[in-house]
Amino acid sequence: LVGLSGSERRRIHELSGGQQQRVALARALAPEPEVLLLDEPLSNLDQALRETLKVELKMILRQLKVRAIYVTHDQSEAVTMGQRVAVMRQGRLEQIATPDRLREAPKNVWLAQFLGHPNIFSEQSLSNATGIQVQGPAILRTDLISLGGNVAAEVLSYENQGSLIQIELLIPSWGLSVQWEGFAREVPSNIYPGKSVSLHIPDDAWVELGRK
């Protein structure tokens, strides 16, 4: 189950870091626990091995139908492993939700910053923006922004990140610059700094935040 067949007689110092973690997992699963606590189980492994083991670990837990509480400081691990994710701040629970819900609707400004939202706007910055219905503070979801619409914008910067394109846009009617990310195949090749474009930004792209 944990991929250690044929290693029964090997000593601990003869095992790799990944194999040692598999031994620890097998020992934890042997008593058939109802709930398994995993505290930073992959933190001492290199990146490539972490990526492999977190997928394997999730499959094993799902196969055995074992509930697990998985503690980690790695956001990508939390999103990969968790059906529900709880974010703690100085010992206090900030929010618990599915990974998608957490990303799409963080509870407050601190959580939005912690999750790395690129477009976080204060109440003051939104108060002078024309045509925006939210009061602020708020985030603007980049995944709901698309090219082609009735919001005029100017490209400030353009960064090719391989399969993704990162674009900074100035929206004159709002007096705000926003970050937008799109798949390279969906972004026209004639986008460049200084070019005027139009954006579609639906009302539900705005998510109001609590202040604390």
Where are these regions (language model features)?
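C-terminal boundary and immediately downstream tail of ABC-type ATPase nucleotide-binding domains
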Residues: 104-128
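Short, conserved beta-strand edge motifs with alternating hydrophobic and charged residues
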Residues: 88, 112-115, 138-141
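ABC ATPase nucleotide-binding domains
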Residues: 1-107
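Gly/Ser/Thr-rich beta-alpha loop segments that engage phosphate groups in nucleotides
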Residues: 19-20, 118, 164
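Non-catalytic connector elements of ABC transporters
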Residues: 129-212
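Residues that scaffold the ATP/ADP-binding catalytic core of kinase and kinase-like folds
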Residues: 45, 105, 114, 148, ...
